[in-house]
Design a protein with these regions (language model features):
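Short beta-to-alpha linker loops that shape the active-site pocket of alpha/beta-hydrolase fold enzymes
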Residues: 91, 120-124
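Short amphipathic alpha-helix adjacent to the substrate-entry channel of hydrolases
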Residues: 99-118, 134
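Conserved catalytic-core motifs of eukaryotic protein kinase domains, centered on the activation segment
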Residues: 97-99, 128-129
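A glycine/proline-hinged amphipathic helix-loop "lid/cap" segment
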Residues: 1-74
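Short beta-strand element of the alpha/beta-hydrolase
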Residues: 81-91
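Alpha/beta-hydrolase active-site loop
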Residues: 127-140
């Protein structure tokens, strides 16, 4: 993985990037890969919610590969005209899985007024930008 120079970062994002560098001093590709494996082991396939259910589905990407997504609904069913929500899980596009967001998504979908779609997008450690963004857009 090549080193990201300050000039590679959009000027308005540079202050946040500097803060992240201080926060994640050990943010190497190896560290992100290790943390991603831990997230997958701990969360993948385990939707921990009191009010919602997650159904795993697959979307075929333009290159023929499969994009895993979760469709989250209220456990008791949803209203007929529920709001749609595209939820991108935490992890800075570098690590994590949709299932780690169950508590937060519960707040939006638990009463049946919202249905959320959570893509298990391509991580930046697997493919460079805009791979994750393209995955998320393809869900729409």
């Amino acid at each position: 993985m090549s080193k990201v120079r300050n000039s590679d970062i959009r000027s308005e994002l540079r202050p946040s990037a500097q803060l992240l560098k201080l926060t994640y001093t050990a943010a190497s590709e190896t560290a992100f890969e290790k943390f991603d494996r831990q997230c997958i082991k701990k969360y993948r396939g385990k939707w921990k919610s009191r009010n919602t259910v997650a159904e795993e589905k697959a979307i075929v990407r333009s290159d023929g590969s499969i994009l895993r997504i979760l469709v989250v609904r209220c456990e008791d069913g949803e209203e007929e005209n529920a709001t749609g929500l595209l939820w991108l899980h935490d992890g800075g596009y570098a690590y994590g899985v949709p299932e780690q967001e169950s508590l937060l998504v519960d707040m939006f979908c638990g009463d049946g007024s919202c249905v959320a779609v959570l893509p298990d997008y391509t991580k930046s450690i697997e493919a460079p930008y805009p791979a994750a963004l393209e995955d998320c857009y393809s869900v729409l």
